[in-house]
């Protein structure tokens, strides 16, 4: 399902340069196939704003190569933005009002940074709730990533997330708990997913409220679950959209925070991510960081060039398969008219007929 470059968003050109298939509007208009319209509510902070676009666009673009995808990025109020990020949003993003007017077949909601212990205290909570309220009635299926999962579960079912003793950070093995669900058809029964979060919603809480858990890790808990109807909301607690080096960038950021005295302890390694060679490189670098901090010297450059060849990606293929299943089912269920969520005869309370 190739992406259509229906705007001048720089992400399209960046993906072209990486080898992704991107259709121009003229070519797309000559294909007599009902396109799909997918919203991306991007709530990530400025440093990750465009990377998040690319990550989710890649997963969408890697799906079935027949249907065309129009991805519509938008954001909400209540998120702190630099002038540069705000300019990017103003130039390339659509407004929520426009999204509502035109309609969507599917909606992806990213994670976000928080500054309060409870989600309803965040400035973005009310605008996000308005998106939830509209999408639940007007979109065939919503896919939530990490914090968006926690927010929508609290909004819909009243379940508050629990603060973990330590950050769940790294790459963890998961196992399917229901191999028959169409969302996980023909994917690996065991697969890895990156996690990066301080909070969790537990399997027991999800199942108590009727959510169907599809993939679990002994170490990291639930990654994949769906709403009681089986499809209308898909919940990720992990980050299957992450690039190879997303966790590396987070680790580098935490080292800088330590050097600047923004955190007291030196950051631990993300679990199951760095091999022995990388760990030794980073142990040596830690000594230089500590020395520079103590003496007030300038910090040496992070040894990224020595590390990149040792970083393995063990999650993207499964992520692409899940996205392919998700969007394929949406295509089968959604109405021919863009503003309506289901074709005639589909039960919204059991769209998959399970």
UniProtKB/Swiss-Prot annotation:
One of its GO terms (cellular component) is cytoplasm. It is an enzyme of class 2 (transferase). The keyword Lyase does not apply. Transmembrane segments: none annotated. Its EC number is 2.3.1.46. It catalyses: L-homoserine + succinyl-CoA = O-succinyl-L-homoserine + CoA. The active site is at 146 (acyl-thioester intermediate), 239 (proton acceptor), 241. Substrate binds at residues 167, 196, 253. Pathway: Amino-acid biosynthesis; L-methionine biosynthesis via de novo pathway; O-succinyl-L-homoserine from L-homoserine: step 1/1. Gene3D superfamilies: 3.40.50.880. It is found in: Cytoplasm. Keywords: Acyltransferase, Amino-acid biosynthesis, Cytoplasm, Methionine biosynthesis, Transferase. The record marks 113, 147 as: Important for acyl-CoA specificity. GO terms for biological process: methionine biosynthetic process. GO terms for molecular function: homoserine O-acetyltransferase activity; homoserine O-succinyltransferase activity. The record marks 196 as: Important for substrate specificity. Belongs to the MetA family. Transfers a succinyl group from succinyl-CoA to L-homoserine, forming succinyl-L-homoserine. PANTHER family: HOMOSERINE O-SUCCINYLTRANSFERASE. This is Homoserine O-succinyltransferase. It comes from Methylobacter tundripaludum (strain ATCC BAA-1195 / DSM 17260 / SV96).
């Amino acid at each position: 399902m190739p992406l259509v470059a229906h705007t001048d968003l720089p992400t399209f050109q960046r993906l072209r340069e990486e080898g992704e298939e991107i259709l121009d509007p003229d070519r797309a208009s000559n294909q007599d196939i009902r396109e799909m319209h997918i919203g991306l509510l991007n709530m990530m902070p400025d440093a990750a704003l465009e990377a998040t676009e690319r990550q989710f666009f890649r997963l969408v673009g890697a799906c079935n190569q027949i249907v065309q995808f129009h991805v519509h990025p938008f954001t909400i109020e209540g998120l702190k933005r630099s002038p540069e990020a705000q300019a990017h949003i103003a130039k390339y993003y659509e407004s929520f009002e426009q999204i509502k007017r035109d309609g969507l077949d599917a909606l992806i909601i990213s994670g976000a940074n928080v500054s309060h212990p409870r989600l309803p205290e965040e400035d973005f909570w009310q605008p996000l709730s308005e998106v939830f309220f509209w999408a639940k009635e007007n979109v065939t299926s919503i896919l939530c990533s990490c914090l968006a999962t926690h927010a929508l579960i609290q909004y819909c079912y009243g379940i508050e997330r629990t603060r973990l003793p330590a950050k769940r950070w790294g790459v963890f093995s998961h196992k399917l708990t229901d191999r028959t669900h169409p969302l996980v058809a023909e994917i690996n029964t065991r697969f890895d997913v990156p996690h990066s979060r301080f909070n969790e919603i537990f399997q027991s809480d999800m199942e108590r409220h009727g959510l169907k858990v599809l993939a679990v890790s002994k170490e990291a808990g639930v990654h994949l679950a769906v709403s009681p109807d089986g499809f209308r909301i898909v919940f990720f607690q992990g980050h299957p959209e992450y690039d190879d080096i997303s966790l590396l960038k987070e680790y580098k950021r935490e080292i800088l925070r330590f050097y600047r005295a923004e955190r007291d302890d030196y950051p631990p390694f993300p679990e199951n991510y760095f091999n022995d060679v990388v760990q030794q490189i980073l142990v040596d670098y830690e000594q230089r960081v500590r020395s520079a901090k103590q003496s007030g010297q300038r910090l040496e450059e992070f040894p990224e060039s020595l590390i990149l060849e040792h970083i393995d990606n063990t999650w993207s293929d499964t992520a692409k398969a899940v996205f392919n299943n998700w969007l394929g089912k949406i295509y089968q269920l959604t109405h021919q008219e863009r503003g309506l969520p289901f074709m005639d005869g589909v039960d919204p309370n059991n769209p998959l007929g399970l």
